[in-house]
Amino acid sequence: MKTKLFTTLISTLALTGICATSAQAFTFKTNFSTTDTTNWKSDIFLNSVEIGSKTYSDFSLVNNVNIIQNDLWTKGNEGAASSERGDNASGVKAENPTASNLAASLGNLNLSNIVDTEDKGKFTLDLFFTKPTDSFLFFERGRNSKLQVQALLADGSTGKSLLLDSSKWQQAGYSLNTTEIATAQKVGSLGVNLFDLGVEDASLFKGLRLVSQSNYVGPDFKVVGVNVAVPEPATVLGLGLVGAALAMSRRKKAQ
Protein backbone atom coordinates (compact mmCIF):
# COMPACT_ATOMS: atom_id res chain seq x y z
CA MET A 1 0.00 0.00 0.00
CA LYS A 2 2.80 2.43 0.83
CA THR A 3 4.45 1.82 -2.54
CA LYS A 4 1.15 2.37 -4.32
CA LEU A 5 0.53 5.57 -2.35
CA PHE A 6 3.98 6.89 -3.28
CA THR A 7 3.43 6.16 -6.97
CA THR A 8 0.00 7.79 -6.93
CA LEU A 9 1.30 10.88 -5.14
CA ILE A 10 4.19 11.40 -7.55
CA SER A 11 1.88 10.89 -10.54
CA THR A 12 -0.58 13.44 -9.16
CA LEU A 13 2.14 16.01 -8.53
CA ALA A 14 3.58 15.46 -11.99
CA LEU A 15 0.17 16.12 -13.55
CA THR A 16 -0.11 19.42 -11.70
CA GLY A 17 3.39 20.47 -12.77
CA ILE A 18 4.76 20.58 -9.23
CA CYS A 19 7.38 17.94 -9.97
CA ALA A 20 8.87 20.06 -12.74
CA THR A 21 11.50 21.20 -10.25
CA SER A 22 13.66 18.08 -10.43
CA ALA A 23 17.18 17.92 -9.04
CA GLN A 24 18.88 18.91 -12.25
CA ALA A 25 20.24 22.25 -13.45
CA PHE A 26 18.38 23.45 -16.53
CA THR A 27 18.96 25.48 -19.66
CA PHE A 28 16.82 28.36 -20.88
CA LYS A 29 16.53 30.82 -23.75
CA THR A 30 17.20 34.48 -22.92
CA ASN A 31 14.98 37.11 -24.57
CA PHE A 32 16.55 40.55 -24.31
CA SER A 33 16.54 44.00 -25.90
CA THR A 34 19.46 46.32 -26.62
CA THR A 35 20.41 49.10 -29.03
CA ASP A 36 23.97 47.82 -29.51
CA THR A 37 24.51 44.36 -30.97
CA THR A 38 27.87 45.32 -32.48
CA ASN A 39 30.02 46.33 -29.52
CA TRP A 40 27.68 45.22 -26.70
CA LYS A 41 28.54 48.25 -24.55
CA SER A 42 25.03 49.56 -23.88
CA ASP A 43 22.10 48.52 -21.70
CA ILE A 44 20.88 44.98 -22.30
CA PHE A 45 17.47 44.42 -20.72
CA LEU A 46 16.14 40.99 -19.80
CA ASN A 47 12.57 40.73 -21.12
CA SER A 48 11.76 37.08 -20.51
CA VAL A 49 13.16 33.56 -20.56
CA GLU A 50 11.85 30.41 -22.19
CA ILE A 51 12.12 27.16 -20.24
CA GLY A 52 10.76 24.23 -22.18
CA SER A 53 7.51 25.37 -23.77
CA LYS A 54 6.78 28.13 -21.24
CA THR A 55 7.81 31.78 -21.15
CA TYR A 56 8.51 33.56 -17.86
CA SER A 57 8.76 37.30 -17.30
CA ASP A 58 7.85 37.70 -13.61
CA PHE A 59 11.26 37.79 -11.95
CA SER A 60 12.44 38.02 -8.35
CA LEU A 61 15.38 40.41 -8.04
CA VAL A 62 18.16 40.74 -5.50
CA ASN A 63 17.22 43.46 -3.01
CA ASN A 64 19.87 42.98 -0.35
CA VAL A 65 23.47 41.73 -0.20
CA ASN A 66 25.46 40.84 2.89
CA ILE A 67 29.23 40.89 2.32
CA ILE A 68 30.64 38.09 4.47
CA GLN A 69 34.09 38.43 2.89
CA ASN A 70 35.47 40.29 -0.12
CA ASP A 71 39.17 40.74 -0.87
CA LEU A 72 40.16 44.35 -0.33
CA TRP A 73 40.73 46.52 -3.40
CA THR A 74 43.39 49.22 -3.20
CA LYS A 75 44.51 49.59 -6.82
CA GLY A 76 44.55 48.01 -10.27
CA ASN A 77 43.44 44.40 -10.52
CA GLU A 78 43.43 43.74 -6.80
CA GLY A 79 40.37 42.85 -4.76
CA ALA A 80 37.57 40.49 -5.70
CA ALA A 81 33.91 41.36 -6.35
CA SER A 82 33.12 44.82 -7.73
CA SER A 83 30.13 46.57 -9.29
CA GLU A 84 30.59 46.78 -13.05
CA ARG A 85 28.60 47.94 -16.08
CA GLY A 86 28.83 48.20 -19.85
CA ASP A 87 30.96 51.08 -21.13
CA ASN A 88 27.89 53.02 -22.31
CA ALA A 89 25.35 51.46 -19.97
CA SER A 90 23.55 52.94 -17.00
CA GLY A 91 24.25 51.53 -13.56
CA VAL A 92 26.83 51.44 -10.79
CA LYS A 93 30.60 51.14 -11.18
CA ALA A 94 32.52 50.66 -7.93
CA GLU A 95 35.91 48.96 -7.52
CA ASN A 96 35.58 48.79 -3.74
CA PRO A 97 31.82 48.25 -3.51
CA THR A 98 29.49 48.50 -0.57
CA ALA A 99 26.75 45.95 -0.05
CA SER A 100 24.33 48.51 -1.49
CA ASN A 101 26.48 48.85 -4.63
CA LEU A 102 26.41 45.10 -5.22
CA ALA A 103 22.66 44.94 -4.58
CA ALA A 104 22.17 47.74 -7.11
CA SER A 105 24.21 45.86 -9.74
CA LEU A 106 22.28 42.63 -9.26
CA GLY A 107 18.86 44.05 -8.37
CA ASN A 108 17.64 45.04 -11.81
CA LEU A 109 16.94 43.50 -15.22
CA ASN A 110 19.86 45.23 -16.94
CA LEU A 111 22.18 42.40 -17.97
CA SER A 112 24.93 44.99 -18.50
CA ASN A 113 25.03 45.48 -14.73
CA ILE A 114 27.08 42.67 -13.19
CA VAL A 115 29.35 41.72 -10.34
CA ASP A 116 32.89 41.58 -11.77
CA THR A 117 35.48 39.44 -9.96
CA GLU A 118 39.25 39.62 -10.33
CA ASP A 119 40.82 36.35 -11.50
CA LYS A 120 42.32 35.44 -8.11
CA GLY A 121 39.73 37.23 -6.01
CA LYS A 122 37.89 35.59 -3.12
CA PHE A 123 34.47 36.55 -1.83
CA THR A 124 31.51 35.21 0.12
CA LEU A 125 28.25 37.06 -0.55
CA ASP A 126 24.78 36.38 0.85
CA LEU A 127 22.00 37.42 -1.54
CA PHE A 128 18.34 38.02 -0.67
CA PHE A 129 15.43 38.43 -3.08
CA THR A 130 12.30 40.56 -3.39
CA LYS A 131 9.89 37.60 -3.22
CA PRO A 132 9.88 33.80 -2.79
CA THR A 133 11.43 31.91 -5.68
CA ASP A 134 12.21 28.31 -6.54
CA SER A 135 14.73 28.75 -9.36
CA PHE A 136 17.67 30.99 -10.23
CA LEU A 137 18.98 32.17 -13.60
CA PHE A 138 22.75 32.64 -13.68
CA PHE A 139 24.62 34.60 -16.35
CA GLU A 140 28.44 34.62 -16.52
CA ARG A 141 30.50 36.78 -18.86
CA GLY A 142 33.43 34.97 -20.42
CA ARG A 143 32.24 31.39 -19.74
CA ASN A 144 35.55 30.59 -18.06
CA SER A 145 34.91 30.69 -14.31
CA LYS A 146 33.48 28.77 -11.39
CA LEU A 147 31.05 29.83 -8.69
CA GLN A 148 29.97 28.00 -5.55
CA VAL A 149 26.28 28.27 -4.62
CA GLN A 150 24.43 27.33 -1.42
CA ALA A 151 20.92 27.99 -0.17
CA LEU A 152 20.52 29.89 3.10
CA LEU A 153 17.73 28.41 5.21
CA ALA A 154 15.43 30.01 7.76
CA ASP A 155 16.93 28.03 10.67
CA GLY A 156 20.40 29.42 9.97
CA SER A 157 21.73 26.33 8.21
CA THR A 158 22.74 25.99 4.56
CA GLY A 159 21.81 23.57 1.81
CA LYS A 160 24.32 21.47 -0.06
CA SER A 161 27.15 23.21 -1.90
CA LEU A 162 26.87 23.27 -5.69
CA LEU A 163 29.92 24.22 -7.78
CA LEU A 164 28.97 25.79 -11.11
CA ASP A 165 31.43 25.75 -14.01
CA SER A 166 30.44 28.32 -16.62
CA SER A 167 32.70 26.75 -19.27
CA LYS A 168 29.99 24.06 -19.56
CA TRP A 169 27.05 26.45 -19.82
CA GLN A 170 25.15 27.22 -22.99
CA GLN A 171 25.56 30.59 -24.69
CA ALA A 172 22.98 33.13 -23.58
CA GLY A 173 22.75 34.72 -27.04
CA TYR A 174 24.48 37.99 -26.25
CA SER A 175 27.93 39.35 -25.44
CA LEU A 176 29.06 41.98 -22.96
CA ASN A 177 31.78 44.62 -23.03
CA THR A 178 32.29 46.46 -19.75
CA THR A 179 34.61 49.19 -18.54
CA GLU A 180 37.34 46.81 -17.35
CA ILE A 181 37.84 44.81 -20.55
CA ALA A 182 38.87 45.78 -24.08
CA THR A 183 36.49 43.69 -26.20
CA ALA A 184 33.12 42.02 -25.79
CA GLN A 185 32.97 38.50 -24.36
CA LYS A 186 30.21 35.93 -24.85
CA VAL A 187 27.90 35.30 -21.91
CA GLY A 188 26.84 31.86 -20.68
CA SER A 189 23.65 30.95 -18.84
CA LEU A 190 22.41 28.19 -16.55
CA GLY A 191 19.36 27.65 -14.35
CA VAL A 192 19.50 26.15 -10.85
CA ASN A 193 16.54 25.18 -8.67
CA LEU A 194 16.06 24.55 -4.96
CA PHE A 195 16.26 20.76 -5.37
CA ASP A 196 19.72 21.24 -6.90
CA LEU A 197 20.65 23.01 -3.67
CA GLY A 198 19.27 20.24 -1.45
CA VAL A 199 16.13 22.12 -0.43
CA GLU A 200 12.92 20.05 -0.50
CA ASP A 201 10.69 22.58 1.30
CA ALA A 202 10.64 25.99 -0.37
CA SER A 203 9.22 27.61 2.77
CA LEU A 204 12.63 27.14 4.40
CA PHE A 205 14.50 29.11 1.73
CA LYS A 206 15.87 32.48 2.83
CA GLY A 207 18.61 33.45 0.37
CA LEU A 208 21.67 32.39 -1.63
CA ARG A 209 25.29 32.25 -0.56
CA LEU A 210 27.76 32.72 -3.41
CA VAL A 211 31.45 31.95 -2.98
CA SER A 212 34.47 32.53 -5.20
CA GLN A 213 37.88 31.04 -4.40
CA SER A 214 41.25 32.20 -5.71
CA ASN A 215 41.34 29.37 -8.28
CA TYR A 216 37.85 30.04 -9.71
CA VAL A 217 39.16 32.55 -12.32
CA GLY A 218 36.91 35.37 -11.15
CA PRO A 219 33.24 34.85 -12.06
CA ASP A 220 31.62 37.93 -13.67
CA PHE A 221 27.95 37.26 -13.03
CA LYS A 222 24.33 38.23 -12.75
CA VAL A 223 21.61 36.17 -11.02
CA VAL A 224 17.84 36.56 -11.21
CA GLY A 225 15.14 34.54 -9.44
CA VAL A 226 12.06 33.04 -11.11
CA ASN A 227 9.27 30.66 -10.09
CA VAL A 228 9.35 27.77 -12.54
CA ALA A 229 7.36 25.01 -10.83
CA VAL A 230 4.12 26.64 -9.67
CA PRO A 231 3.27 29.91 -7.92
CA GLU A 232 3.41 30.17 -4.13
CA PRO A 233 1.99 28.72 -1.94
CA ALA A 234 1.53 25.61 -4.10
CA THR A 235 5.30 25.44 -4.62
CA VAL A 236 5.82 25.19 -0.87
CA LEU A 237 3.17 22.50 -0.54
CA GLY A 238 4.39 20.62 -3.60
CA LEU A 239 8.04 20.52 -2.59
CA GLY A 240 7.08 19.46 0.92
CA LEU A 241 4.88 16.63 -0.39
CA VAL A 242 7.57 15.44 -2.77
CA GLY A 243 10.10 15.40 0.05
CA ALA A 244 7.69 13.46 2.28
CA ALA A 245 6.94 10.99 -0.50
CA LEU A 246 10.62 10.38 -1.19
CA ALA A 247 11.27 9.85 2.50
CA MET A 248 8.38 7.39 2.68
CA SER A 249 9.78 5.48 -0.28
CA ARG A 250 13.21 5.23 1.35
CA ARG A 251 11.65 3.88 4.56
CA LYS A 252 9.74 1.28 2.56
CA LYS A 253 12.92 0.09 0.87
CA ALA A 254 14.74 -0.09 4.19
CA GLN A 255 12.08 -2.39 5.71
Residue ranges and their predicted role:
Residues 1-27, 218-248:
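Short, threonine-centered small-residue motifs that mark membrane-proximal processing/anchoring sites
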Residues 26-119:
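N-terminal targeting leaders for non-cytosolic proteins
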Residues 128-135:
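Extended extracellular/luminal ectodomain segments enriched in beta-structured repeat modules
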Residues 131, 142-144:
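Short proline/glycine-enriched turn/loop motifs at strand-loop junctions of beta-rich domains
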Residues 135-139, 209-211:
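Residues within well-ordered beta-strands of beta-sheet-rich folds
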Residues 145-156:
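Short, surface-exposed beta-strand/strand-loop-strand elements in extracellular ectodomains
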Residues 159-229:
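Terminal, low-complexity interaction segments
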Residues 247-255:
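C-terminal membrane-anchoring or membrane-association module
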